[in-house]
Amino acid sequence: MTTKEKLLALLEDSKGTFFSGEEIARTLQVSRAAVWKAVNALREDGYTIDAATNKGYRLSPDSDILSPQGIRRFLKPEYRDLDLTVLPTAPSTNALVREKANQGRPEGCVIVACEQTDGRGRYGRQFFSPIDSGVYLSLLLRPTAYSPQQATCLTA
């Protein structure tokens, strides 16, 4: 995990709480300069990171960007190591998961997008999935020995 990803995970886990640059550097085992670079990189990605003298940095409570770190904090511990990709936009999460399946990825690969430009629903019909109106995801499953009735529960 990069310093930027580690910093985002730390800030997401304690959203709204200030951390001094020194405290972050010690926790992530990096220099203060590396912390500063990671903060700026997150800001460039659109995250609202507040900085206050004698308080430090915090992820603004109003920050609402979907991220793997933000999702993982709500997952049960046994699911936190899933292969999780979050994209602002994707042609189709299902098509991307299908590509991963064809590459031999194991069950549990998840693709999440804030928008799909070519989403498909049942029978290949177009699935309208614009930005800011939902979260779209596909999960790679490799079920074995499912009856047609059980498969309906997975696909409906």
Spans of features found by a protein language model:
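N-terminal lobe of the biotin/lipoate ligase/transferase fold
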Residues: 2-156
